[in-house]
A protein has these predicted regions:
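Membrane-embedded multi-pass helical conduit in multi-pass membrane proteins
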Residues: 4-7, 14-17, 28-32, 290-367
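Cell-envelope/extracellular polymer assembly enzymes that use nucleotide-activated donors
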Residues: 49-52, 80, 238
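Short beta-strand-to-loop acidic/aromatic patch adjacent to the donor-nucleotide binding site
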Residues: 126, 135-146
Length: 392
């Protein structure tokens, strides 16, 4: 009669097989997404609506100048760029001043305002910046996001549909340098998160990915403005929830962006991932638990530990590793972020991810830029600062 360990190893193997299937499908969907990322004939510039892009800043960070400059290099004619900080001593100011000098013809505004509006300082910063936004199409973009020159055109084209209330973009991890810690951080995003997002969209989920959030001013005002988000840690999730309550869709722009992976120590990386894990777990506990399927090498290793005397377990582990490596190569090509040296470390990366999931199971507090914040579940739309009614 099979022992408990044999049963456990068999169950882990089944989950690992499902994880391999998810990795293959997710990698294929991502590659297809990039292949379809074509440049249509550029429309007449006079037909493009004016856009205000809001970039909240907080201190210096690796590749900050490069990320901010990618906004200044947009192939978009009617563009206002608003940067915001909350202290005159903020080290990000020097980067903005340099861009203003380098791009004198660009409409670049720097807002320095210490006023706080709630627990979410990023949204508080955005509230201060919003007062200077002149245009009706608004794009909120994180400070560490690198974008191609057609980023705004792709977003605006997607937002043109009357059924679309919010546009977001995929993002890949871009290591600020070739260090083990930063490569590990990029693997988590590129090989686990990205294929998982593609798979979830195939199954019908329409989440707001907070690195880019674009919407029309009228929609923002209907949901209660930025003030409706300022008392929530997961402002992107709350915004997406509110837009869907208006019976509007969350669309994905046909472009990929890149987020800087700038952690300098393993402790810093683990705390970052733990913060992200706890946030997602508290917002979507079932979905977060199901995401464990994205770790086929973890489950294959568990199979090997339970059935180490069985030859099939070793063959199975090697096969899963090979499949995982092949899908990782496909993702590397699709994201244009080479990480070939990390392929032998994929099992270690997945065990770290599993440990993060276990650590995320308890606790509703996260550390973020010097703050300790409490994460809440999705609030009902009626609890936002202004009630929402579909069709308003």
């Amino acid at each position: 009669m099979p022992s408990f360990l044999t049963w456990l190893g068999g169950a882990a193997a089944l989950i690992s097989v499902a994880g391999c299937g998810q990795a293959i499908i997710g990698s294929f969907l991502l590659s297809r997404f990039r292949w379809q990322e074509r440049r249509p004939p550029c429309p007449d510039a006079s037909n493009l609506p004016a856009v205000t892009i809001l970039k909240p800043l907080h201190g210096d960070e690796p590749l900050l100048s490069e990320a901010l400059e990618s906004v200044c290099r947009q192939d978009y004619p009617h563009l206002q760029i608003v940067f915001g900080v909350q202290s005159t001593e903020d080290t990000a100011i020097s980067h903005v001043r340099a861009l203003q000098a380098r791009y004198p013809t660009r409409d670049i505004t720097l807002v320095i305002d210490p006023q706080q509006h709630g627990i979410n300082r990023k949204v508080g910063n955005l509230i201060n910046m919003y007062a200077f936004a002149r245009h009706d199409v608004l794009v909120i973009s994180d400070s560490d996001i690198h974008a191609g020159p057609h980023y705004l055109r792709d977003i605006v084209r997607t937002l043109e549909s009357p059924q679309v209330g919010l546009v977001t973009t995929l993002y890949a991890g871009l290591p600020a340098s070739k260090t083990l810690v930063r490569e590990m951080g990029a693997i988590q995003i590129n090989h686990n998160f990205l294929p998982g997002v593609m798979m979830s969209r195939l199954l019908g989920r329409r989440d707001c990915l907070g690195a880019t959030m674009a919407l029309r001013r009228e929609i923002l005002e209907q949901i209660g403005g930025l003030e409706a988000l300022v008392d929530h840690v997961a402002d992107d999730a709350v915004l997406g929830h509110a837009v869907r309550a208006l019976d509007l869709d969350i669309a994905l722009a046909p472009c990929l962006t890149w987020t800087t992976i700038g952690e300098s120590s393993m402790r810093e990386l683990l705390l970052h991932e733990l913060r992200w894990g706890r946030t997602v777990k508290n917002l979507e506990p079932v979905g977060y638990g199901m995401s464990a399927i994205q770790l086929p090498l973890f489950w294959a290793t568990l199979t090997l530990l339970c059935c180490h005397d069985a030859r099939w377990a070793w063959v199975f582990f090697g096969t899963v590793w090979l499949i995982r490596a092949m899908t990782a190569i496909g993702v590397n090509i699709a994201t244009a972020v080479p990480a070939w040296a990390m392929l032998p470390l994929l099992p270690l990366r997945e065990w770290i991810s599993a440990a993060i999931m276990v650590g995320s199971a308890r606790g509703k507090e996260v550390a973020w830029r010097g703050q300790t914040l409490h994460i809440e579940r999705h609030v009902p739309v009626t609890n936002l600062r202004q009630p929402l009614e579909p069709g308003d």
